[in-house]
Design a protein with these regions (language model features):
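Conserved phosphate/anionic-ligand binding catalytic regions in large, soluble enzymes, centered on
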Residues: 125-135
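C-terminal nucleotide
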Residues: 1-124, 138-176
C-alpha cells in the first residue's frame, strides 16, 4: 500500500463516486469553510456544490502532468518527425478527452470544433485556455494547413457567421 505513482494513488485512495462536503470534512477532520479561510468566492462555490468528483479531478491533473512530460520527452526524442507528430497528436487527443470527461471543462461548441479539426486533417486537437468556452489548438502538418483552414471555416465557422455569432471580417482572429 502506498504507491509513489500519483495515478495509482488516486485509484487506491479516492472512490470514483462523488464525495459530499460532509464526507470530505469527516476525512479531513476539518470544516471546508475553514480550509478555504472563509473566502467569499470559495464559500459561494461550496454552497452551490452538492458533490465533489475528487477521483476524476485528481486523475485529470496527474494524467495531464504525465502528458506534459511525455510531450517534452517526445519533442526531445530521436523519433522520426512523422513518429513525433503522431505521438504528439495522440497526447493532445488524450488531453482533450481528459479535460472533457474527467475535468468537465469543455462545452458543446469546443467538442464540435475539436471534432471538426480531427476530421479535417489535425493529428491532434484539444481545448486550451481556461475551458468552459475557451479556444482549441490543433496540430496540423504544414503541408495540410492550406486545406485544413478552409475546411474548418466551412464546417464549423460558416454557420456561426450566418447566425451572427462570429463576424466574417474577424475570422482571422479565430482561425490561424
Amino acid at each position: 500500500r502506498g504507491s509513489s505513482d500519483p495515478l495509482l494513488a488516486v485509484k487506491e485512495y479516492l472512490k470514483e463516486e462523488p464525495y459530499t462536503a460532509e464526507e470530505i470534512e469527516k476525512i479531513l477532520e476539518e470544516k471546508l469553510p475553514s480550509i478555504v479561510n472563509n473566502d467569499p468566492t470559495s464559500l459561494a462555490v461550496l454552497n452551490a456544490a452538492t458533490h465533489f468528483k475528487l477521483h476524476q479531478r485528481a486523475a485529470h491533473v496527474y494524467s495531464e502532468a504525465r502528458r506534459v512530460h511525455g510531450f517534452k520527452d517526445t519533442v526531445n526524442s530521436n523519433l522520426s518527425d512523422e513518429e513525433k507528430l503522431k505521438k504528439l497528436g495522440d497526447l493532445m487527443n488524450e488531453s482533450h478527452y481528459s479535460c472533457s470527461v474527467l475535468y468537465e471543462c469543455s462545452c458543446p461548441e469546443l467538442e464540435e470544433l475539436v471534432q471538426v479539426c480531427k476530421e479535417n486533417g489535425a493529428l491532434g486537437a484539444r481545448l486550451t485556455g481556461a475551458g468552459w468556452g475557451g479556444c482549441a489548438v490543433a496540430l496540423v502538418k504544414e503541408f495540410d494547413v492550406t486545406q485544413f483552414i478552409p475546411a474548418v471555416k466551412e464546417k464549423y465557422y460558416k454557420k456561426r457567421v450566418e447566425k451572427g455569432v462570429v463576424k466574417k471580417e474577424d475570422m482571422e482572429l479565430y482561425l490561424f
